[in-house]
Amino acid sequence: MTIPEKPQGVIWTDAQWQSIYATGQDVLVAAAAGSGKTAVLVERIIQKILRDGIDVDRLLVVTFTNLSAREMKHRVDQRIQEASIADPANAHLKNQRIKIHQAQISTLHSFCLKLIQQHYDVLNIDPNFRTSSEAENILLLEQTIDEVIEQHYDILDPAFIELTEQLSSDRSDDQFRMIIKQLYFFSVANPNPTNWLDQLVTPYEEEAQQAQLIQLLTDLSKVFITAAYDALNKAYDLFSMMDSVDKHLAVIEDERRLMGRVLEGGFIDIPYLTGHEFGARLPNVTAKIKEANEMMVDALEDAKLQYKKYKSLIDKVKSDYFSREADDLKADMQQLAPRVKYLARIVKDVMSEFNRKKRSKNILDFSDYEHFALQILTNEDGSPSEIAESYRQHFQEILVDEYQDTNRVQEKILSCIKTGDEHNGNLFMVGDVKQSIYKFRQADPSLFIEKYQRFTIDGDGTGRRIDLSQNFRSRKEVLSTTNYIFKHMMDEQVGEVKYDEAAQLYYGAPYDESDHPVNLKVLVEADQEHSDLTGSEQEAHFIVEQVKDILEHQKVYDMKTGSYRSATYKDIVILERSFGQARNLQQAFKNEDIPFHVNSREGYFEQTEVRLVLSFLRAIDNPLQDIYLVGLMRSVIYQFKEDELAQIRILSPNDDYFYQSIVNYINDEAADAILVDKLKMFLSDIQSYQQYSKDHPVYQLIDKFYNDHYVIQYFSGLIGGRGRRANLYGLFNKAIEFENSSFRGLYQFIRFIDELIERGKDFGEENVVGPNDNVVRMMTIHSSKGLEFPFVIYSGLSKDFNKRDLKQPVILNQQFGLGMDYFDVDKEMAFPSLASVAYRAVAEKELVSEEMRLVYVALTRAKEQLYLIGRVKNDKSLLELEQLSISGEHIAVNERLTSPNPFHLIYSILSKHQSASIPDDLKFEKDIAQIEDSSRPNVNISIVYFEDVSTETILDNDEYRSVNQLETMQNGNEDVKAQIKHQLDYRYPYVNDTKKPSKQSVSELKRQYETEESGTSYERVRQYRIGFSTYERPKFLSEQGKRKANEIGTLMHTVMQHLPFKKERISEVELHQYIDGLIDKHIIEADAKKDIRMDEIMTFINSELYSIIAEAEQVYRELPFVVNQALVDQLPQGDEDVSIIQGMIDLIFVKDGVHYFVDYKTDAFNRRRGMTDEEIGTQLKNKYKIQMKYYQNTLQTILNKEVKGYLYFFKFGTLQL
């Protein structure tokens, strides 16, 4: 059937129009992010009903989630109602309003369940079956594995003994059980699980398949060997330009001869590679060599680096791929064959017994849904059954959403009920393989990729492929930068799909033309000497600063009205790969009083209230578990103190269990009577609850504990009470759900919880935040899929990929099967086998490809602006990333395969575009004009150096030191104030021309020049300074008066910031009243008052400087400035080493037309014997002369007026500069 001509003025693009009306063959719509695929899918359904007269219940619409199904059905229903209202006489539309309720718009699991309910007789099962809960399924499978393993322990087959020796430890066989479980889940994701398990042994027995594996490794090795040879040649070329390096060149020439032999004839000679030594040691670079090449120091270092890279690449091939001879690898495969075959037998036994148990309990799980549906739809030979034929006749079209996330079983089910072949079928599939991120759920993106490569745009002889590439979500800056990154990152070799013109994103949203560049911010960690915070904590604080900046400066564009509004909390989302950073972010946002919510399905078991209840349950189940028993005793419920626990243990130091110590203490005549009574009450509770648990279900035991100790009421009254209460009720509800399964009892419930914790399967904190609540959100990339946000902060880019599974002794792969390491039972030594090496390499490639797709999902969530946050320990590593090798339009394959994290690739790609210092042979394009607009990145790269605030560091805290919060005690000249504010907000006019914006605090310049004057080498770096000084103090520190010197300095500055200046001076009583006012306003903490040096402040109030300020014409406090160093130092404009200076001036006052600045100092200093006040004053002036010079010159530069200054030391007095 031909596609109707698109009328003028319709909202659909040409590709969308084709997607709506294409028919007569299978259709695959590759719908890029934000391309409106849901709207297209709904419109296609509607047109099938309106234009083609098809009944809605004769369409099968398969969605990925139940929520998507409900939304889809609602949209279709609304459109039918609108059409029916417009044409009330249309009987067909009236019928559709009735039939919509029976329409098959659902997940595939729901369709399978309906199929089973209608044809249960074919399966010979009880029609009154129920679906097992997750808890029940986990426990039943665990129980089955235990029983099957016990049966095989009774048999003690030699292959089983070898398996247990290889996969179990002396202490447990947990790893063995885990591998069995993984194999079970892998197998049931295939249409024929038994057949898949039977084929696992084939590569171990057949030499033809072993030869294929060796070829696979050889091809992969060629990538690294070629890269190694390139690095070797670069090293040779660099050394060839130098003097006195003949010995180095000789070594490299020998290596080149060896490598030429390996690569001879275009083939990789693996035997020659493994049989010879490569990477001879280069001679040392002596002082004489350095002197002879003093103008080529960088080239010398680069040459050494290239040779080191050559050695590491060769070492990788020899250690990772061919650590042993090919014949030895094949021999190991023969030895492993019986073990692999026996392991498959165990898994088949587990599968059989597990199915038997489920049938006996009359329960089904989701895997049963799929396999029973397939059993109904196929004959024994695999051909479609009569029932399948009837469904083929019934469904006129099958529409599948999120097709990239289907697995092989689901694909087989769909093939049974679709009609025709690809060239004349009725299967409509929509999805985006670049967003296939569910491999851990056995999703198989290769299904999409195979069809994408096979189908054609015109559909001749096969299915039709349609590319939806126009993005209606994001600004063009987000799209072009995303395109640029993936154009150079993703291809068939790494990423599994080519990111070409058909795959890239095209701008389609009606935004205005204002500039909103993507921001790549690289945080360089402060070391332990300069910050008490860990790198992750520093990143969390930095993220908060980005959020504050968005809220203060950014706006959101309303496409409907064409106007802007201010950004709010809910416009911002923080995306990370996992929730590992959640706690740090929660604390950092809490410190700044910014509402923040973690949209988590993790972390539930770590919540204090949940841990308390679980400790209670574990202690009741078995009080001989010391950790949980003592945890319960120390909780808010029983409130035993540490010294009480110590008393108990001291009397019985050799007891195996603390419970025994409690009993012995109660019976000891020397025991403290009060503590004995307390312990008796505690043990009475334990015994009472134990008795209660024998006769009541777990949920009633939990309910009794809640009521007896007012647990709900207590935690509801704490910070975050709503969430805590929800968590407690959530655990109670899970216990009810557990009791509704076929399992019972406290022990089984605890075992179920332990299994969830071990598997990393979490209930998640109960969600008390709605979608419209005005909070900043954090979520994983997985949970953000399908969503969009005005501002996306994609952080955690420097967190390494999780390659833990690659280190396991057994590697699983849907396509290839099972790769098991070889274990020599006699020598008790493990070696990589041919299969484990090959499958590990394949798995690593698939892992990196999926991580790339996660990056794509994250980047394409942003509507207005995208922030990318990376973190490095030092800036030297950035130079290495800038110089990553390339191959054609992509980062070299070897670099991508071994990339440790997303930042590694993203920074390398974007820096190659921006940095002028990168050689042409490492750039993707020599001329920016070569780049098409759709993939020309618009990105600002900032290198940011983290540093904590100290008493000598200029304070940047926005809460107290914002120009917008200026305090003046006098009615100053508003024009002058506006002029000062305008000029102090000066910004470097050529900022758009800079590649890496640079900024230095005045304190840093002070330290820099001090270092230069001392003769020490100091590298001037471009940087931002970030300061945090208002961390929430632990209560025990406040109570013990242990406020640090830098905190006292910050406290004194805060008091001085708000100090009133009166001509009659303020009294000591008024000073106390003023500080009490700061406490009432929550500007300072209540416990901080004792640390304020009242006598020192009173000394200042009684000083001549205070009187001068009080009589001034204007007074301005806490003024930040950002100014070009070139203007201050009178350097030539365009000097590339010039930095932007950033600082904060404590106070400026104007008297008799002259501007004065004041800088407060809380320094402590030693008054050496014999030194006069004049000598001390001179010493202190010298200490801060550079900093003061910059203050004075900066103000004189931007005000164009005479400026004088004062230093005020609380422990010394006034110094006029």
UniProtKB/Swiss-Prot annotation:
InterPro entries per UniProt: AddA, DNA_helicase_UvrD-like_C, DNA_helicase_UvrD/REP, P-loop_NTPase, PDDEXK-like_dom_sf, PDDEXK_AddAB-type, Restrct_endonuc-II-like, UvrD-like_ATP-bd
Cofactor(s) in the UniProt record: Mg(2+)
Entry keyword Plastid: no
Domain UvrD-like helicase C-terminal per the UniProt entry, residue ranges: 476-786
Catalytic activity: Couples ATP hydrolysis with the unwinding of duplex DNA by translocating in the 3'-5' direction; ATP + H2O = ADP + phosphate + H(+)
Record GO biological process: double-strand break repair via homologous recombination; recombinational repair
Physiological role: The heterodimer acts as both an ATP-dependent DNA helicase and an ATP-dependent, dual-direction single-stranded exonuclease. Recognizes the chi site generating a DNA molecule suitable for the initiation of homologous recombination. The AddA nuclease domain is required for chi fragment generation; this subunit has the helicase and 3' -> 5' nuclease activities.
UniProt-listed PROSITE patterns: UVRD_HELICASE_ATP_BIND (PS51198), UVRD_HELICASE_CTER (PS51217)
Matches recorded under HAMAP family: AddA (MF_01451)
Family: Belongs to the helicase family. AddA subfamily.
Assembly information from the UniProt record: Heterodimer of AddA and AddB/RexB.
GO molecular function list: 3'-5' DNA helicase activity; 3'-5' exonuclease activity; ATP binding; ATP hydrolysis activity; double-stranded DNA binding
Native source species: Staphylococcus aureus (strain NCTC 8325 / PS 47)
Binding site for ATP: 31-38
UvrD-like helicase ATP-binding domain segment(s): 10-475
Keywords: ATP-binding, DNA damage, DNA repair, DNA-binding, Exonuclease, Helicase, Hydrolase, Isomerase, Nuclease, Nucleotide-binding
Pfam family, one: PDDEXK_1
GO cellular component terms listed in the entry, alphabetical order: cytosol; DNA helicase complex
Name of the protein in question: ATP-dependent helicase/nuclease subunit A
EC number: 3.1.-.-, 5.6.2.4
